[in-house]
Swiss-Prot record:
Primary location group: nucleus
Protein name, entry field: B3 domain-containing protein VP1
S-S pairs: none
Gly residues compositional bias, start-end: 17-30
Location in the cell: Nucleus
InterPro entries to which the protein is assigned, alphabetical: B3_DNA-bd, DNA-bd_pseudobarrel_sf, LEC2-like
One Gene Ontology biological process: response to abscisic acid
Species this protein is from: Oryza sativa subsp. japonica
DNA-binding in keyword set: yes
Biased composition (Low complexity): 1-16, 64-85, 421-436, 505-514, 684-693, 713-727
Keyword set, alphabetical order: Abscisic acid signaling pathway, Activator, Developmental protein, DNA-binding, Nucleus, Transcription, Transcription regulation
Length: 727
């Protein structure tokens, strides 16, 4: 710290002719009369601290935030070591220890010192400024009777002041009545440094620079003599207490804590501007305008912002004041808050803040000791399976307004998300399916659709499975037996009427060889493709779907599973018919529908006619996992029930259980077991029988149309549940 005078142009608020050197390192320095100060500077002898203050190699050098505790711009007469005025120096201390590099203002001249001297609050209060009366100690040191205090809570500046006071006694002319400096004054500073070794080091003391002319001029402006010297000393020590140590310790603790806990996170600020708890006197001063409060942190409302003692129970263990006109002096300076008070602060919601080390109840809780919770939203939301949450909570308010409101953009993003989820579900389904196969030893397991897609309600074990694929048990047993398995429903196989089931075994016997070859080929193809097929969607056909328009309206989930459409014209998709292995060239497109889309599958007329699909039937679309091609299959669920409903004797047959119906079922099952041609017919008969049993008790009082409609609904419901279970 440099208090040199005469090194720059005069800078003062008031009487420039009488100002003393009270300026700090960053800005202008206070000046005594130029001629007097230059003359004094020319004949001053500067003594290094090494002459009176021994080196302390055993003390750890706690590096301060800047290269030196106070930035100094001294003249050539100044020394970077800790110096003491050789002669005629008042016991004043660099009252200008403000530096621009430390972020504080400076006491620009002696006029500001005089402003500090004219405080309304008396110096001698009930509680002294420091634990020991520094003024009495210095006065005793001047008179040759030093009193060693236990803790003089000043800084390196405090030591410089006090040693400068000793030097002034040695000189013994300008400011006070001369008396020799005591020999044990260096020992007193050694003991003081020992008691404060955690906060100050010998290097910090050696970085302080002091000029005798500045001390003399300042003391002279304060009245001269011992009284002026003591007043100057008190002002300097007060300034050091309220600014320098409060700045140095929090910053040092923050830097150390940030380096130890998380070096990637920056320090919360180079100028925190904390004020420690007030318990002593409050002095209005213009010197307090030199520092800026920490702007990055605003105390929450729960804190209250009240100044409290470190040990007091309260939500805010330190005071953060934005006052420009007060300097808070604590009766117990620089004492960190207790762990209980710091715990209250962290429990009140400040745990995410990076606090100085002394505020944390444990060493590990300084700066970012709490990990940030993951903000990634869950991939699914409750209520609708497969619906992806957009994660808008992560968007800032500014980005929320830019969120695409266009239906097209929103649809594209939604489709992309659902496609990604569909791929993930597919992979998980494959892994689970393979693991189940290895565990059970069976080559065939239910498809991913039944395990991971839309929830299904399993039907009773006694119901015959009429679904798209035969039950897994039949597929497993087919390679081990000579009996052919019933193949998938083919489009060209004639469907029996209710009156034809009796001659069915004879027809099956005549065409046994051909059916055997066809069913064997179907088995191999089915066993191969069933492992690779993934269910995409199904659609119950309406009258418009099977009419002359030649298009089928697809459900909404088509936009997820089928190729993405960018234009209304759509894309051409080759669809392989699972039953006939014929490839149909269909066109997948959409119609704009009230800010939404209606998806269509065109060029389906030939497919519907070849499979003899009518209203109430449904189609199922698959994708081949390996090849990526699409497969389609038509399933008929209404023929037997509808034709039986049209006949007048259908109600009686179902109600009384005529032998003809069981005969139909048994014959159909037998035919399916022998030549594999009656699989679908037997399934239809079983569905019709189930439908008849379900509503047989209530068919007597209904019209034929009502009976037919109820049976169709029952058959459709049973077929969809059976299909889901079998798949």
């Amino acid at each position: 710290m440099d208090a040199s005078a005469g090194s720059s142009a005069p800078h003062s608020h008031g009487n420039p002719g009488k100002q003393g050197g009270g300026g700090g390192g960053g800005g202008g320095r206070g000046k005594a009369p130029a001629a007097e100060i230059r003359g004094e500077a020319a004949r001053d002898d500067v003594f290094f601290a090494d002459d009176t203050f021994p080196l302390l190699p055993d003390f750890p050098c706690l590096s301060s935030p800047s290269s030196s505790t106070f930035s100094s711009s001294s003249s050539s007469n100044s020394s970077s070591a800790f110096t003491t005025a050789a002669g005629g120096g008042c016991g004043g201390e660099p009252s200008e220890p403000a530096s621009a590099a430390d972020g504080f203002g400076e006491l620009a001249d002696i006029d500001q010192l005089l402003d500090l001297a004219s405080l309304s609050v008396p110096w001698e209060a009930e509680q002294p400024l420091f634990p020991d009366d520094v003024g009495m100690m210095i006065e005793d040191a001047m008179s040759g009777q030093p009193h060693q205090a236990d803790d003089c809570t000043g800084d390196g500046d405090t030591k410089a002041v006090m040693e400068a006071a000793g030097g002034g006694d040695d000189a013994g002319d300008a400011c006070m009545e001369g008396s020799d400096a005591p020999d044990d004054l260096p020992a007193f500073f050694m003991e003081w440094l020992t008691s404060n070794r955690e906060y100050i080091s010998a290097d910090d003391l050696r970085s302080i620079r002091l000029r005798r002319s500045t001390i003399e001029a300042a003391a002279a402006r304060l009245g001269g003599g011992r009284q002026g010297t003591m007043q100057l000393l008190k002002l300097i020590l007060t300034w050091v207490q309220n600014h320098h140590l409060q700045k140095k310790r929090p910053r040092t603790a923050i830097d150390d804590g940030a380096a130890s806990s998380d070096p990637q996170l920056p320090s919360p600020g180079a100028n925190p501007g904390y004020e420690f708890p007030s318990g002593g006197q409050e002095m209005g001063s213009a010197a307090a305008t030199s520092w800026m409060p920490y702007q990055a942190f605003t105390p929450p409302a729960a804190y209250g912002g009240d100044a409290m003692y470190p040990g007091a129970a309260g939500p805010f263990p330190f005071q953060q004041s934005c006052s420009k006109s007060s300097v808070v002096v604590s009766s117990q300076p620089f004492s960190p808050p207790t762990a209980a008070a710091a715990g209250d602060m962290h429990a009140s919601g400040g745990g995410n803040m990076a606090w100085p080390q002394q505020f944390a109840p444990f060493p590990v809780s300084s700066t970012s000791s709490y990990t940030m919770p993951s903000v990634v939203p869950p991939p699914f939301t409750a209520g609708f399976p497969g619906q992806y949450s957009g994660g808008h909570a992560m968007c800032s308010p500014r980005l929320a307004g830019v969120e695409p409101s266009s239906t097209k953009e929103a649809r594209k993003k939604r489709m992309a998300r659902q496609r990604r989820l569909s791929c993930l579900q597919q992979q998980r389904s494959q892994q689970l399916n393979l693991s189940q196969i290895h565990i059970s030893g069976h080559p065939q397991e239910p498809s991913p659709r039944a395990a991971h897609s839309a929830p299904v309600t399993p039907s009773s074990a006694g119901c015959r499975s009429w679904g798209i694929w035969p039950p897994a048990a039949q597929i497993i047993q087919n390679p081990l037996s000579n009996k052919p398995n019933p193949p998938p429903a083919t489009s060209k196989q004639p469907k029996p009427s209710p009156e034809k089931p009796k001659p069915k075994p004879q027809a099956a016997a005549t065409a046994g060889a051909e059916s055997l070859q066809r069913s064997t080929a179907s088995e191999k193809r089915q066993a191969k493709t069933d492992k690779n097929l993934r269910f995409l969607l199904q659609k119950v056909l309406k009258q418009s779907d099977v009419g002359s328009l030649g298009r089928i309206v697809l459900p909404k989930e088509a936009e997820v599973h089928l190729p993405e459409l960018k234009t209304r014209d759509g894309v051409s998709i080759p669809m392989e018919d699972i039953g006939t292995s014929q490839v149909w060239n269909m066109r997948y497109r959409f119609w704009p529908n009230n800010k939404s889309r209606m998806y269509l599958l065109e060029n389906t007329g030939d497919f519907v006619r070849s499979n003899e699909l009518q209203e109430g039937d449904f189609i199922v679309i698959y994708s081949d996992i390996k090849s990526g091609k699409y497969l389609i299959r038509g399933v008929k669920v209404r023929r037997a029930a509808q034709e039986q409903g049209n006949s007048s004797g259908a109600v009686g047959k179902h109600k009384h259980g005529s032998p003809e119906k069981p005969g139909v079922s048994s014959n159909t099952k037998a035919a399916g077991a022998e030549d594999g041609t009656g699989g679908d017919d037997s399934a239809e008969a079983a569905a019709a029988a189930a439908a008849g049993k379900a509503d047989g008790g209530g068919c007597k009082g209904k019209s034929p149309h009502g009976v037919r409609r109820s049976r169709q609904e029952a058959a459709a419901a049973a077929s969809m549940s059976q299909m889901a279970v079998s798949i």
